[in-house]
């Protein structure tokens, strides 16, 4: 194999509960991850030496600051291969809570493993990914999964009924560290709709769309909305335009609204795109 092209799918959190701060500075979470169709695209090819990363689309670093580069460097140092050229077409909004960087790292682990026949299993790749970021193991596995610990301890779940989504990313990014510091300062702040993980798990297992919808929620939403009130404004706007539910993605600032169908999602998006150019229609996988 000389060239390989892979998608790097983003994610949302259907539910996200913060269980407390750990001694290592991270936080224990319980979250239901869900892959979405919105994706970056990465092409991998062999080169004589080193790691060469070329990017297009949204602006991202091309060196060691990029998680895709760091994923390739990790496998190169641990398992050895001469060199790889990576071409990244970046489409997932940056610093949005959609795991765009983690998705690129996961695709790189998968792509380099296949290109150079390293023979690593998905479980081994997920463990390598855990050293790069908390969301990388899920992005390696994909689909629907319950995450514990930092999010890296995964239990696979049955696939969801398709949910049509309107993603809205404001013009600013959010510091994940700042959001968690805010949570530490005022733990237990109640979001507009608290996540109901047990109900969500039961609904997912029986394919109950209404039950899934009623269970959505994110413990970090109240913190991020206090720090960045526009996130709450986006949430309310999505609901006003016809979204059935609206929940913040990860630590924010992007918000996803769930629409009844694709046509409704496109209509909602058309009403928000003038104010929020980074408004995207996608669906769960």
UniProtKB/Swiss-Prot annotation:
Pfam families the UniProt entry points to: GHMP_kinases_C, GHMP_kinases_N
Positions annotated to bind ATP: 93-103
Secretion signal span: none
Domain of life (superkingdom): Bacteria
Active-site residues (renumbered): 11, 135
E.C. designation(s): 2.7.1.148
Molecular function via GO: 4-(cytidine 5'-diphospho)-2-C-methyl-D-erythritol kinase activity; ATP binding
Function: Catalyzes the phosphorylation of the position 2 hydroxy group of 4-diphosphocytidyl-2C-methyl-D-erythritol.
Sequence similarity: Belongs to the GHMP kinase family. IspE subfamily.
Protein name as annotated: 4-diphosphocytidyl-2-C-methyl-D-erythritol kinase
Gene source species: Moorella thermoacetica (strain ATCC 39073 / JCM 9320)
